[in-house]
């Protein structure tokens, strides 16, 4: 296993030293040094999966930073009892799309065979000199890790797999609106791209004996917010019963010809749609395009949530506080609690307000923090300043 003995550099913008794991309920928290003030854990292990926080590294240029990030994540994997061969899913956040090739070359050095699934998008990062951030989900040693390759599709020449199956769970790569069988475009119409994405997802899931009905979580990256409504019209047609939990953000992709990339997680088993009550206790209302949360087994996948109101319209801290209150009501409705959170992603429209968001975040989550990434993107709400999406495990 390729691991350099480096200090972890993450979103706290300081060097951190890992210390032994702590246990909280059904999750194992991989802790940093107690002197760290970071409101996220390096990793959280729960069930068969290990959730690793978004991680940065210092260095000159994309290649040096990408190696530093992957070495840092390798140290966290080692502390969790795993290594690179157990990684199932990676999300790569690049400051500049021009750094894609350099990042890709380094990534391939670490994942030379049976690589994980991967999503790569352009976002803002918390540190001005940071060029790349990566977060991961890994599979505990001893649990199944099977690469999914649809029949008739050419083997991927890029360092990622189309799908990874572990037990009842499938992680899909970020899927684009093209015909993967022939590696050809389906045109620039957003609805055609959306339909192509779900046809591709259907074929990947079929290899595992699963279908779109098993999808529980969806992260949607769209390049132009004016396309959101048309995308939704095509999207909702694929989930007539229980739509997955979802977050949708504006982000640039690695190819200018594409307007949409979607990352999915599917879990076989009986699903329960969670509809949270309103703040005043009245019944909540279902959305045709997403579930507030989806419960399957001992896991809960929550949609990205916002906290926009007349009082918080220009207040990032206020929006974060209201968002986390909404998340709390959603957890309660599902029979979960804050301590069950294992993984999250925070989308901010202005990364200079990262500290303001964290004030509210620490009020709601006071210890045994979930793993977390925090990046800068556009949101679908014109007044939205922060959106937060979580996974919980009991």
Ranges and model annotations:
Residues 1-6:
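Positively charged n-region of N-terminal signal peptides that target proteins for export
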Residues 7-17:
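Bacterial N-terminal signal peptides
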Residues 19-89, 94-199, 203-217, 222-342, ...:
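N-terminal presequence-like segments and the immediate start of the first folded domain
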């Amino acid at each position: 296993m390729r691991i350099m003995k480096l200090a972890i550099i993450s979103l706290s913008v300081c060097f951190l030293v890992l210390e032994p794991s702590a246990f909280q309920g059904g999750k194992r928290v991989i802790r940093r040094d107690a002197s760290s003030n970071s409101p996220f854990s390096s990793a959280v292990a729960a069930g068969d999966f290990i959730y690793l926080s978004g991680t940065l590294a210092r260095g000159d240029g994309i290649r040096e930073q990408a190696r530093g990030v992957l070495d840092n994540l390798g140290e966290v994997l080692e502390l969790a009892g795993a290594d690179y061969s157990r990684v199932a899913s990676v999300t790569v956040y690049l400051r500049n799309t021009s750094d894609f090739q350099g990042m890709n070359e380094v990534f391939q050095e670490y994942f030379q065979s049976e690589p994980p699934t991967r999503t790569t998008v352009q976002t803002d990062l918390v540190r001005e000199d940071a060029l790349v951030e990566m977060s991961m989900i890994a599979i505990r040693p001893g649990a199944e890790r099977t690469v999914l390759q649809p029949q008739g599709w050419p083997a991927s020449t890029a360092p990622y797999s189309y799908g990874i199956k572990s037990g009842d769970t499938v992680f899909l790569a970020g899927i684009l609106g093209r015909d993967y069988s022939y590696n050809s475009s389906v045109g620039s119409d957003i609805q055609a791209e959306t339909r192509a994405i779900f046809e591709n997802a259907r074929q990947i899931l079929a290899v595992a004996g699963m279908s779109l009905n098993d999808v529980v979580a969806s992260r949607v990256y769209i390049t132009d917010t004016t396309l959101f409504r048309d995308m939704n019209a095509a999207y909702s047609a694929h989930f007539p019963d229980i739509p997955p939990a979802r977050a949708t953000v504006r982000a640039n992709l690695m190819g200018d010809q594409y307007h949409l990339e979607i990352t999915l997680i599917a879990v076989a088993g009986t699903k329960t749609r969670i509809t949270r009550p309103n703040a005043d206790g009245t019944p909540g209302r279902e959305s045709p395009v997403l579930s507030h949360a989806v419960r399957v087994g001992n896991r809960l996948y929550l949609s990205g949530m916002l906290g926009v109101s007349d009082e918080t319209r220009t207040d990032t801290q206020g929006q974060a506080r209201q968002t986390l209150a909404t998340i709390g009501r959603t957890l309660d409705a599902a029979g979960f609690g804050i301590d069950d959170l294992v993984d999250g992603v925070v989308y901010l429209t202005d990364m200079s307000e990262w500290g303001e968001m964290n004030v509210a975040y620490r009020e709601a989550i006071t210890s045994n923090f979930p793993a977390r990434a925090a990046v800068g993107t556009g949101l679908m709400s014109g007044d939205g300043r922060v959106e937060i999406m979580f996974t919980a495990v009991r």
